[in-house]
Amino acid sequence: MMRRQQIMDAAKKVFAARGFGGATIESIAEEAEFSPATLYLYFNSKDDLFASLNLTMLQQLTSKMEHVRDQALSPQKKIDELARALYEVYLLDPLNVVNVLRYQSKERLQRLSPGLSSQISDYTRKCMNTLAEIFEKGVRNGDLLDRNPAAFADIVWSLFSGLVLWEDTKKGFGSGKDLLQPTLELALEVINRGIKKTDVH
């Protein structure tokens, strides 16, 4: 188990420094101080290794979403907490989160070993269902617009993904200031106001 974690820690560094395309099993093995053959004992391919990091992020994200969902808060307060929770997931490992979001694709999922592919699909579904459940009670109680909670979840996830990737892109333009947190909070505030149900007189 320690070897597997050591390999994943090394992979995080190499993917962060070189990106998915520039990383190789050999460079990851060198960083981990193992032979490439040792890496293949734990991971079938570079894709599987990268996806294992993806799975870790999904597990952390799902845990944060479940915490927000289970709090005894109003729907509006939960949406405020959602912005904080998403940013906390990003802070756990910013470069890995960026890489994971940048390289998500159906084609990549199809290249994974069946067991890992199934795990990622299951956790993605669980994460999005939990995100939808944060909105579900508010819709049911009439506090939020009567729309599909899954659509709200898709909007929030798209916003988070887009903002993370855009902030990373801006760094390439020489913009050194990280505005992800205030921008994410503003985006969720706009959503919060927009989906709040108001009485029409």
Each model region followed by its residue ranges:
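N-terminal intrinsically disordered/low-complexity leader segments
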Residues: 1-2, 13, 199-201
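Helix-turn-helix
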Residues: 6, 10, 14-48, 52
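Short coil/turn segments at alpha/beta junctions that flank glycine-rich nucleotide-binding fingerprints
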Residues: 17-21, 71-72, 93, 141-142
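Hydrophobic alpha-helical connector segments
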Residues: 52, 56, 66-96, 153-156
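Amphipathic alpha-helical packing segments from all-alpha helical-bundle domains
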Residues: 59-62, 66, 111-141, 150-154, ...
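Amphipathic alpha-helical segments used for helix-helix packing
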Residues: 91-115, 167-169
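Hydrophobic/aromatic-rich alpha-helical bundle segments in the mid-to-C-terminal region
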Residues: 97-99, 139-187, 199-201
